[in-house]
Regions:
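Conserved pre-ATP/AMP-binding loop-to-beta segment of ANL
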Residues: 1-14, 21, 44-50
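Conserved S/T- and glycine-rich ATP-binding loop of Class I adenylate-forming
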Residues: 9, 15-18, 51, 101, ...
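Conserved AMP-binding A3 loop
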Residues: 10-34
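Conserved ATP-binding/catalytic segment of the ANL
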Residues: 15, 215, 222-282
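Conserved AMP-binding/adenylation subdomain of ANL enzymes
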Residues: 33-50, 57-144, 178
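Conserved ATP-binding loop and adjacent catalytic segment of the adenylate-forming AMP-binding
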Residues: 78-80, 153, 157-159, 166-226, ...
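Gly/Ser/Thr-rich phosphate-binding loop
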Residues: 99-102, 112-200, 304
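AMP-binding/adenylate-forming catalytic core of the ANL superfamily
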Residues: 232, 237-238, 261-354
Length: 354
């Protein structure tokens, strides 16, 4: 039998990491084992269970959650052969009825906005999003509609890879939809924080996973955002043939500096605020995290993607409209421009004055 060698290099996964330059992340077998073991600890899958693989295998999130996780248990893996549009994904869920679903936030957000909320009366949809306590029958109907869209046979949807829209998350939380948020990075193969959906706190990404330690580099982690630093079995060996970059991200005490800013409550739940290098500092001294504003924009009518930046000390949003959806509803180019201006005005009313 082959001797176990936990520190042996298993995978080199290339990533832009925290500096923008492509680097080869050297993941040892212990990292892959620890990540896969955590998946089974949180949500065991059985031989014959169905899993739809729609994340890119070149991304460690897809490699672990959409392949190694199910493969190690003898699950049946189904690979999408086309780009995962909401329509194609919904069709695959209906046919395959997966037991576990792993995806990026945008997929869930698009399906919720296009395929679930339209099934509810607009007034009810708005009520669910804004009122903390709603009628149990309304919540049950909304939850059932959402479950059916995703195949109706899953235990939990695992969302990761990008910030999750706050409004969509509030909707899912209110109807009792089984989702969880996973936070991580390639350098940890990938998971750093996560929790079961029953215990996940809204807006957080859960707690440190098994065999990992997480700290917030801040004088007051509960109220002042600081950099997320971590260490444990999931950590990489370093960057391939790049010791200088390795020493810049892993300090002498073995802590990996993620470059992400977050707070942590007294129970250990981590809430990511944004990237330290993305933080915008205004002339008035206000710290603004563009991801939080972009998340709101991306949930507004006919918005596909957004980018918030600072120009001459003014916040500016670059918007790429959802032209397919807009044209399908009969909107002209002029109508789309007017809608974007309406979105801007509405969002400004929700944001702090600074």
């Amino acid at each position: 039998y082959r001797k176990e060698m936990p520190e042996e290099l298993a995978v080199i996964n290339y990533t832009s990491g925290t500096t923008g330059y492509s680097k080869g992340v050297m993941l040892p077998y212990r990292s892959l084992w620890s990540n896969i073991a955590y998946c089974h600890e949180m949500l065991p899958v059985k031989p014959g269970d169905h899993i739809v693989s729609m994340l890119p295998m070149g991304h460690v999130f897809g490699m672990v959650y959409d392949f190694l996780y199910g493969f190690s248990a003898g699950a049946h893996l189904y690979f999408l052969t086309r780009m995962p549009s909401p329509k194609i994904i919904a069709q695959s869920f209906a046919e395959i009825k997966p037991r576990v679903i792993s995806c990026v936030p945008l997929i869930v957000e698009k399906i919720i906005k296009k395929d679930i909320l339209p099934k509810l009366d607009n007034k009810i949809g708005k009520l669910l999003l804004k009122v903390p306590i709603v009628n149990d029958k309304i919540k049950a109907a909304a939850r059932q509609a959402a479950m059916e869209i995703f195949g109706g046979n899953f235990d939990e949807i695992i969302i990761g890879g990008a910030p999750f829209n706050a409004e969509v998350e509030a909707f899912l939380k209110q109807i009792g939809f089984p989702y969880t948020i996973a936070y991580g990075m390639t350098e940890c193969g990938p998971i750093i924080c996560s929790s079961r959906w029953e215990t996940l706190k809204q807006a957080s990404c859960g707690k440190a996973t098994s065999r990992m330690e997480v700290k917030i580099d801040s004088p007051d982690p509960k109220s002042i955002a600081g950099e997320i630093i971590c260490k444990g079995m999931n950590l990489m060996l370093g960057y391939y043939k790049n010791p200088e970059a390795t020493s810049q991200i892993i300090d002498v005490n073995g802590w990996l500096h993620t470059g992400d800013l977050a707070t942590m409550d007294s129970e250990g739940y981590v809430t990511v605020r944004g990237r330290s290098k993305n933080m915008l500092l205004t002339s008035s001294g206000q710290n603004i995290y563009p991801e939080e504003i972009e998340s709101k924009f991306n949930n507004m009518p006919y918005v596909s993607e957004s980018l918030v930046l600072l120009q001459k000390d003014k916040l500016v949003a670059l918007i790429y409209p959802d032209f397919d959806d807009a044209f399908a509803h009969g909107l002209s180019q002029t109508d789309i421009e007017r809608m974007m201006e309406t979105n801007r005005i509405e969002l400004n009313q929700q944001l702090p004055s600074y």
